[in-house]
Amino acid sequence: MPEGPEPLDWTGQALECGACRFQDLLESGHCGLGWSCLNDRYAKRIERFFLLNPELADENLGHPYFETRVQAARTASVFRLPRLLADEDPAVRGMAVLRLPAAHAERLIRDPDRAVRIAVAHRLPPGGLLPMLQDKDGHVRLIVARRAETGMLPMLCADPDPEVRAEVARRIDPAFLDRFRTDPEPLVRRVAARRRPGLFVADDDLRVRHTVAEEGGREELRRLVSDPEDIIRETAIQRLAHLKE
C-alpha cells in the first residue's frame, strides 16, 4: 500500500515501473510504486525493496543514488563491500565500515566526515583506538573514551570537552583520579568524587561536596558535619548515624 511522500526518483522525476528492469517483481508483490522501490528517493521504500529482494543487493552497490547504495550495503555480501570504503558518499562509507570486519575500519580513521569516523570508533577493537584519541570531533572522542582500553585514558584527562572528561573519570584507573581535583567543570569532579570521595571533601562546589557526603566513608563524613551548607551537613550526619548502626 502506498505511503509517505509522492513516489519520485532521486532526481525528482516521476517513476515509471514499465521502464524498470525489475518490473517482473510487481506480479509477486516484491515491489510496488509508492511502497517498495529501489529507484524511489524515499529511504524506507528502498529499504523495503532490499528486505524483500536481498538477492539483488550485490548488483545494486553501484547504483547512482547514494541512498540505494546504502540500503543495498545493508544486505549485500560482505565480500562485495570493501570497494565501498572509497565511495564518494559518507553514508555509504559508514555503512561499509559497520558491516565489514573491524580490520577494514583502520583505513578510514582519518576520514573527513565525522559520521564515518564515528562508525570507525564503534568498530575498531579497544586496543586499536589510540590514533583516534586526538580526533577533532568531541563526539568521536567520547566514543573512544567509552571503548578504549583503560590504559589509554590518561591521555584524555585534559580533553577540552567536559563530557569526554566525565567519561574518562568514570572509567580510568582510580589512581589517576587526582588529576580531576582541579578540573574546571564541577560535574566532572562529581563523577570523580563518586569513586574517590576523599580527594574532593574540600571542593569549592557544594554539588561536589554533596556527592562526597553521599559516597564518602567515616573520615570524609566527619569533616563534612561542619560544612557551611545545611544540606551537606544533614546528609553527612544522617550517613554517619547509618554507618554506626
Curated annotation (Swiss-Prot):
This is Uncharacterized 27.7 kDa protein in nifB 3'region. It holds the Pfam family LRV.
